[in-house]
């Protein structure tokens, strides 16, 4: 069965303490036809290097580093970049069950 592409949009701002667990849980989804759009919203901590490390390991990740403009503007940019038939928003302190996207 053909799986439609799901775009997972993750705005990030100063989330270094939660980010590895969050992105790791997104990458581990049992539903594999996903694009992961990570938008670093001008973080001043080590969030960007954490995101870059995940991008280097997973080609499904699109990483955008931008000036801080707030979460609403950042989510809207993610929507503009999304190519999926469906969209999921995830916050940087979320941890997803492996079947989260499959249940969509």
Regions found by a protein language model. Give the residues of each.
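Nucleotide-sugar donor-binding/catalytic module of glycosyltransferases
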Residues: 1-104
């Amino acid at each position: 069965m053909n799986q439609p592409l799901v775009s997972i949009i993750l705005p990030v701002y100063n989330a270094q303490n939660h980010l590895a667990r969050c992105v790791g849980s997104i990458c581990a989804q049992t539903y594999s036809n996903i694009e992961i759009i990570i938008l670093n919203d001008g973080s001043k901590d080590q969030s960007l290097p954490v995101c870059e490390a995940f991008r280097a390991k997973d080609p499904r990740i699109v990483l955008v580093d931008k000036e801080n403009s707030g979460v609403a503007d950042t989510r809207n940019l993610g929507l503009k970049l999304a190519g999926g038939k469906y969209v999921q928003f995830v916050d940087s302190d979320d941890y997803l069950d492996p079947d989260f996207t499959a249940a969509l």
